[in-house]
UniProtKB/Swiss-Prot annotation:
Keywords: Ribonucleoprotein, Ribosomal protein. Pfam families: Ribosomal_S16 (PF00886). This is Small ribosomal subunit protein bS16. The keyword Ribosomal protein applies. It comes from Paracidovorax citrulli (strain AAC00-1).
């Protein structure tokens, strides 16, 4: 099964997450199929904290990829920001 989830990067105390499409059996930070965007929880004002390639996200969902709960929450957050802007 293919899943859209977060893959952690960054250093200790400074997390940075890539939003990736990966096989469910592969470890969290392991091999992935495609990188769809990123999430920076420590982004300051004026910095981009979240970017998602909506066209690729739609494609992967259409071919049956499951979205993790956290990524689903981030997608909704990005949609709210897009409407507000």
């Amino acid at each position: 099964m293919v899943v859209i989830r977060l893959s952690r990067g960054g250093s200790k105390g400074r997390p940075f997450f890539n939003i990736v499409v990966a096989d469910k059996r592969v470890r969290r930070d392991g091999r992935f199929i495609e990188r769809l965007g990123f999430y920076n929880p420590t982004a300051k004002e004026g910095e981009e904290g979240l970017r998602i390639a909506q066209d690729r996200l739609t494609y992967w969902k259409s071919v049956g990829a499951q979205v993790s709960d956290t990524v689903e929450r981030l997608i909704k957050q990005a949609a709210k920001k897009a409407v507000a802007a």
